[in-house]
């Protein structure tokens, strides 16, 4: 339970749920429904594909899906409030509402901190378990929240044109539209091929992210690696405007030269 200490610090109490959803559209709508009840106290809302859970379980046989289901998506939702009982009641009410209208098909509310930590262990194990699964071509993109389902559909189709056998693993922070999007080599493939066509896969994913009003760099920045690609994906006028702003603010070009904005020749 939350309490105020002698230095005036307030502890934060959290309520955490593991939810099964039938579609990416339902995941996005579920976020809106939970926010109707919890507002800005929704501090985490992670969408996880069932295939990623399978990868974690293959890598860590002791890990169990808190709510086994044939549905394609899981959501790890957490709200944070001053009082534990208030957080739990709010999330329970939101989940009951979501279950009634079909946005959530099933849900497990963590009974204690240990169970909540177990939920998070699954989420945090995905990157390393994906690596153990095999070769993957990874991306860090963002799209407007409302466009997440459409992006997932068109990006999967675009990747399939380049790498028909690739397995897609997309997971991330629905609340801000940040997605970790990977094209993975099928398990046990005799001759891995994705590494040789990674540039084409990345171009396809990034093109779709931009087409949906998103960004090719969500959490990890643009830097030098994505600078030229980003310039190629936006209009010359947009690049020229950014260069003009850069010159006005940094006429000596001493702040991160050559990063994000291409140098003018």
Task: Name the predicted role of every residue range.
Residues 1-265:
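Noncatalytic alpha-helical scaffold of FAD-dependent oxidoreductases
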């Amino acid at each position: 339970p939350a309490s105020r200490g002698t230095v005036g610090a307030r502890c934060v109490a959290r309520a955490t749920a593991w939810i099964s959803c039938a579609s990416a559209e339902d995941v996005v709508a579920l976020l809106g429904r939970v926010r109707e009840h919890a507002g800005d106290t929704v501090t985490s809302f992670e969408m996880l594909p069932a295939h990623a859970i399978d990868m974690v379980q293959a890598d860590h046989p002791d890990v169990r899906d808190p709510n086994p289901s044939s549905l394609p998506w899981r959501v790890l939702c957490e709200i944070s409030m001053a009082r534990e009982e208030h957080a739990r009641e709010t999330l329970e009410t939101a989940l009951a509402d979501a279950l009634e209208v079909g946005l959530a098909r099933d849900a497990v509310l963590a009974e204690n901190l240990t169970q909540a930590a177990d939920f998070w262990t699954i989420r945090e194990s995905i990157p390393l378990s994906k690596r153990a699964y095999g070769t993957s071509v990874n991306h860090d993109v963002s799209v407007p929240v409302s466009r997440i389902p459409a992006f997932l559909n068109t990006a999967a189709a675009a990747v399939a044109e380049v790498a028909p056998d690739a397995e897609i693993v997309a997971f991330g922070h629905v609340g801000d539209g940040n997605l970790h999007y990977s094209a993975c080599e099928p398990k046990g493939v005799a001759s891995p091929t994705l590494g040789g066509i990674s540039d084409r896969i990345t171009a396809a994913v990034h093109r779709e992210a931009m087409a949906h009003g998103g960004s090719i760099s969500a959490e990890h920045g643009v830097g030098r690696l994505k600078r030229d690609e980003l310039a190629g994906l936006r209009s010359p006028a947009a690049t020229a405007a950014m260069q003009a702003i850069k010159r006005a603010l940094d006429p000596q070009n001493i702040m991160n030269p050559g990063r994000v904005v291409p140098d003018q020749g």
